[in-house]
Every structure is written in C-alpha cells, then in structure tokens.
Regions:
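Short beta-strand His + acidic residue motifs that chelate non-heme Fe in jelly-roll/DSBH
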Residues: 49-51, 67, 73-80, 96
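Residues immediately flanking
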Residues: 45, 69, 90-92
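Polybasic "coupling" helices that flank or enter modular domains
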Residues: 153-158, 168-170
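All-alpha amphipathic helical-bundle segments outside canonical DNA-binding/catalytic cores
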Residues: 124, 140-156
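Generic protein-terminus/edge-of-domain signal
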Residues: 1-64, 71, 101-107, 113-117
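A hydrophobic/aromatic-rich effector-binding and dimerization subdomain
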Residues: 2-19, 76-138, 164-168
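A general structural signal marking secondary-structure boundaries and capping sites
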Residues: 69, 140-143, 162, 166-169
Length: 170
C-alpha cells in the first residue's frame, strides 16, 4: 500500500453499530483508509468499485462488501449517476458479547481470510436481505417501547444472513 500514498484511520464508532442509508450523486470519495470497526457496504444503485487490500471489486446492486477492521480500502465512485448504498459500522465486541455462541462477526473474519470480501446473494438471499433491511428501517422510525431492542435484534438477524452467505472455510 505504500505506493498508494499514506493510509489514514477514518471514522469513529461510539455506539454498538451505526447504520447509514445514503443516496447522492457526489459520493464522498476518500483516499485509502481503514477503520477500528467492521464495515459492511450494500450497494442499492449506482456504479462503484472498491479496492480492498489491493483487490478491486466491481459492486453491482445488492452485492455486499464485508470489510474487517484494520483492512485498507477505498471506494472509486462513478459520479455520473446516483449512488445509493447502505453502510453499517459495527462494533464486533458488542456482538460477540451479546451472542457469543452465534459468532455473528465470523463472516468478516472468513471473508478476510479467504480474500473474498464481496458477497453476491442469490434471489432468495436478496429477498431476505430486502426484508431484513425494510424491517430494520421501519424499526429505526419506531418510537415505541422496545424499538431499540427490536433494532438490535434485526441487526443481529442481518449479520446471521450475511454469515450464511459467506462460504465456509475449506
């Protein structure tokens, strides 16, 4: 990575996870960087490539990129069309404490070990992701009792779905 210039740490996570649903035409392009937390990127529309540890991935709608903490990456955004994506920053320690037997963050470690960070869901998996995201976004807008617990549970369900999509180690 030295040939790419300096690599910086970006973003801070002060909660268990942070969910972004973004749509714009500018797309904030950054130089190579890493985070202290795990990150998932789900492309909904637009054109973007991600370089992760010197491997370039062309994202298609409904593909998911798993980026483990300390992994160097950069987005290359085509700014000629709207870029809609979901980005989730995750505190792996929280999820490990919440459900240690579920190993919810293993999908990031398996993707990192295999060097295959891009998940391409089949039709059934895509429907499950769509339903999970819709339920999570509805829960985000819900002010009633238990809404926070519902959001946490739905985020865990999304991590379970992603874990099912990552191929098992040989």
């Amino acid at each position: 990575m030295e040939s790419e210039g300096s690599v910086s740490r970006e973003g801070y996570l002060k909660e268990n996870y942070h969910y972004f649903h973004l749509k714009d035409t500018a797309g904030q392009e950054r130089d190579f960087h890493f985070h202290e937390f795990d990150k998932l990127v789900l492309l909904l529309s637009g054109r973007v490539d991600y370089v992760v540890e010197n491997v370039s991935y062309e994202l298609e709608p409904w593909t998911v990129l798993l980026i483990k903490h300390h992994t160097i990456h950069k987005a290359l955004i085509d700014k000629t069309e709207p870029y809609e994506r979901i980005i989730v920053y995750l505190d792996g320690k929280y999820f490990e404490r919440a459900m240690p037997e579920a190993r919810l963050m293993d999908c990031f470690a398996r993707a990192d070990r295999s060097g295959r960070h891009l998940l391409v869901p089949d039709k059934r998996q895509r429907r499950e992701l769509e339903a999970g995201i819709q339920a999570f976004e509805q829960a985000m807008a819900d002010p009633r009792f238990g809404a926070r617990a519902m959001r946490d549970t739905l985020m865990m369900q999304l991590l379970i779905l992603l874990g099912m999509m990552v191929p098992a180690a040989p």
